[in-house]
UniProtKB/Swiss-Prot annotation:
One of its GO terms (biological process) is nucleotide-excision repair. The keyword DNA damage applies. Its main location: cytoplasm. The gene is uvrB. Forms a heterotetramer with UvrA during the search for lesions. Interacts with UvrC in an incision complex. A motif (Beta-hairpin) lies at residues 97-120. It comes from Streptococcus equi subsp. equi (strain 4047). The lineage of its organism: Bacteria, Bacillati, Bacillota, Bacilli, Lactobacillales. This is UvrABC system protein B. GO terms for molecular function: ATP binding; ATP hydrolysis activity; DNA binding; excinuclease ABC activity; helicase activity. Belongs to the UvrB family. The keyword Ribosomal protein does not apply. HAMAP family: UvrB (MF_00204).
Amino acid sequence: MIDKRDFKAFKLVSKYAPSGDQPQAIETLVDNIEGGEKAQILLGATGTGKTYTMSQVISKVNKPTLVVAHNKTLAGQLYGEFKEFFPENAVEYFVSYYDYYQPEAYVPSSDTYIEKDSSVNDEIDKLRHSATSSLLERNDVIVVASVSCIYGLGSPKEYADSAVSLRPGQEISRDQLLNALVDIQFERNDIDFQRGRFRVRGDVVEVFPASRDEHAFRIEFFGDEIDRIREIESLTGKVLGDADHLVLFPATHFVTNDEHMEQSISKIQAELADQLKLFEAEGKLLEAQRLRQRTEYDIEMLREMGYTNGVENYSRHMDGRSAGEPPYTLLDFFPDDFLIMIDESHMTMGQIKGMYNGDKARKQMLVDYGFRLPSALDNRPLRREEFESHVHQIVYVSATPGDYEMEQTDTIVEQIIRPTGLLDPEVEVRPSMGQMDDLLGEINLRVERGERTFITTLTKKMAEDLTDYLKEMGVKVKYMHSDIKTLERTEIIRDLRLGVFDVLIGINLLREGIDVPEVSLVAILDADKEGFLRNERGLIQTIGRAARNADGHVIMYADRMTDSMQRAIDETARRRAIQMAYNEEHGIIPQTIKKDIRDLISISRAVEAKATEAETNYESMTRSERQEAIKQLQKNMQEAAELLDFELAAQLRDLILELKAMD
């Protein structure tokens, strides 16, 4: 078992002090957690600094914390913010490592088998390994995750028990170490030294842990004893220092020892025999032949290599679980007394609920037609009630908590006051008759003042028609639809802020996570059409997009007042009254947020430009110039990785290797 380091407290680093009603929110949340409250809601209005409040709570309760977001983009933003707040602690990132993923499936109507096809992002895989190893080695850990955290991951006990612990002076032969590394799925490659690999040079073994991307370790032997362990730069071999202890975790999360492997294979064979009998009794000879061929091949691979493609489908046997028992997930790597924070909980909890059913429907088809054993159904995401069983203490964070969260707890901590003094916007309702001309007049007013406008519609056709109409009227406008990729979306938001265009039209893209202080008008068309996009929560989230500007204003175009509209307007007015009273009492004049227009796109392009320049000129460089270029590229590679632009980081890494090969 791995001995954790001495307890280290979380240390929050920030130039800001809590303000507005952050202090009371922080104090109440902390008191409730320390008092044993299982669940509570942080109801924080848009722009009130919920992430900062979360960070303050984590630093005061000093518990390992899992922060769950509903998509990779939001998880990436939170990861960056927590890294800034906690530079001395372990802040980790755990999302799906697939850049592309086509799950294994079978379509009976056309007799089409779709083989699993995927592209794994090496950088995210490294970050996942970093998260699990940190959780087993230390206490001061924050993991920011997507709903990937409820998917099967392999047994934390097997993962920890398989780890190889090394110290100077330890009696172990070089060959014993090599065998131990192979057992935990490290691959020997004396030429191409990458994560999850090792190389051997005489009495020196160099190992590249799966959780690192720059630093490797050099283990020097004297006979059958470790003489010294040194940390080195993986690219240059430069020695960074000596280590008095090294723990090497497996290169894959699905790992088991030889004894357990044989037991697992016996169980797989027994299940195969039972399923073959069932198919033959039902006259499904094709399915029986298919299942026998596939499973026996996988068994042979497991025996010889300890691994096979799709090994996760046998995880129930390898983990020693019973049928129907939940899989091990990231949650099992945390200690019992850990804290969960669910960001944008009204979205995230819905995702957690929905993952299981979709996964089961697809896998059941594979089982019925002989592509997989029934135990493959137990390689699955957790059900919501199974997720709940892992909860020791939880904080739901949202401006608009969902029904589920409200059912879980009566403890609601409000954070309504913005540190900037900004108020929730005024909301007015206007008739839909003549709305185009009315809206055009409002847009022109904002353009004259150098401000921006958001317009949200209900249908794609209406968004397209409105875009065409406004263009004809001379308005600089863009329509952001669901086919636009994340990076393009970031670029569109940046262009809106820069004034490349003045109006952005969308359907469901104008709610969570879009921060544009220049927007002073939000127009909601068809506000009286009740439904997912026009319910109370959807309307409050959309109204919140105008809450970062001192002149924020919202116009709902509708022919009648629905209950959802009334509740959204009343809640906004309630918050606005609280904020105005606070400002008056403290002599605060609301100021529009001044936020630098600096984002992933612009920085990535600057880095990419430097990379392209270096690539164009490096052949004519002197050796010393090349060394300087390498240093700059390594810095750029780090910047790209920190921005989660892993594709660019990989390109820069390859360019660095080319430059080094020239010397």
